Amino acid sequence: MYSFMKDQYEQKQLKFINGTFERIRHFPFRRYPLTSFEDVTVRRDKSVNNDILLIYIYAGTHSHAYGNLKYFIEKCVRQGDHVDYYFILQQVDNKPINESDMPLLTSKTAYYIQHENKCYDFGTIGWFFDHYTIGNPWKNNSLVDKTNRKINLNKYKYFIFMNSSIRGPFFPPYFIELVSKSNINYYWYSIFTNRINNYVKLVGCTISCETVPHVQSYLLVTDLIGLSILLKPGNWGGAYPEGIFTCYPTKDHVSLYSELPSSNRILESGYMIDSLLTKYQHINFSEPHNKFCNSNKNPFINNAFQGTSLEPYEVVFVKYNDFEWTKDSRGRAQLYEKWNNDIKLVNRSSW
């Protein structure tokens, strides 16, 4: 009976992939519809070394931080996804964090590293570069440095910086279905890395025009050229002479001398910045008439993006913390997460 039904329902369907229509065969019955990339079995090319370095800054400074980290690890971190993950745990009062209490890392290329919480994200990333990497084009490494440090920046094609103030990724179920049937190597990060090219060198979820247009730093993606621009010492782009990845004492210092200069430097180098926001596609933010977008408002504040709040399915990651002024997108993300969990709990079948 099952074989008969399979023969009856297995079919060829048209799909639009990479600009062309292809016919694929698939059996449409499944225990429940796909809801996230954790459900997708993706072809892994074991012959390719990891070419993405991801640095995630975790600070348990709000009630959702642990949940954000757990959600990300469970949905995204997979063996063979071409990413080296470094989760930096910011210690409170310099007290070691019990890593057995943290979400389990099942990938052999995912690691926890502990650091005293005396810097914000950019300063902590700078500490990581100074203590664990070689290959910084602006620093001469001694033989001792090369012996003590193990991560060569030059082996990576892309670099992702993010923190525990956000939750995601969120993708519409129909997008997950499309990816699952296309039989291509598409990962959660591909929606960002695919936007990096010869013209675009800094990508994130959102661009804010508060003060000046800039990619918001809760998630930043760049390549080796972009990283070289960001790593360069000096006050270029509005940074302090020490550079962008400096340990600044306050959040305002970080915004003024790290976050804003990151985008400034990319634009001043003749490259573009980009985000997932539909409104800002193919906009050259180096042009003066584009510098006052969205009335210079921060888009992730409730109803601050042309009278609307950010949609998780558009920007993939949203602010998810205790602030009242981010509750709209946080509430929507919470609802999507519940709906996706409900699909599995009720063992709903796909038709």
Task: Describe the residue ranges of each PLM region.
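ER/Golgi luminal nucleotide-sugar-dependent glycosyltransferases, focusing on the catalytic module
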Residues: 2-351
